[in-house]
Amino acid sequence: MAKFILGKKLGMTTIFNEAREALNVTLVECASKVSMVRNEEKDGYSAVQVEMAKTKNKVYKKEFKGASAEMKVGDEVGVDSFEIGDKVNVSGLGKAKGFQGVVKRHGFKGSAASHGHKHDLRAPGSIGAGYPEHVIKGKRMAGRMGGKRVTSKNIKVVLIDKEKNLMALQGAVPGVSGAVIEIYTVK
């Protein structure tokens, strides 16, 4: 059975395991409920829509396909469906970095800082030849960076607190603190 939940990223911290090794983890608060159930007969596919209230006026909804048909509208989806050691995928909106140059955005090397160079150390260089007389599509240039949907795969669940509905995931997950993320098991 597929496991899935919506959660709010609280931030990162360090915890210690039984072998006294330090683990960098991301804490996620998970409190969501089923808002719609789709079935094969009526809709042509089976899925469960889960919602989570971030503020009083803002509700996030996400549909997870291939979910259990035993769920009903209003059922709570908590962290108790996950187990320590589970591998999950985490999706969310990555951090936006604004307008960035080619060195940060695409990893260009830049020009040498010696041999007569005074300016343009981080310039992109030529953007095309004389003949086509236009810039070719897909040319890597400066522009807006980040702020797109990102999925981190095979992240390990290292701690579950059922009373507080908290989950600790090993490593970093997409988004800023307070962002809504989707957590689901690896197929």
List the predicted regions and their residue ranges.
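Extended basic (Lys/Arg/His-rich) segments that typically form rRNA-contacting surfaces
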Residues: 1-187
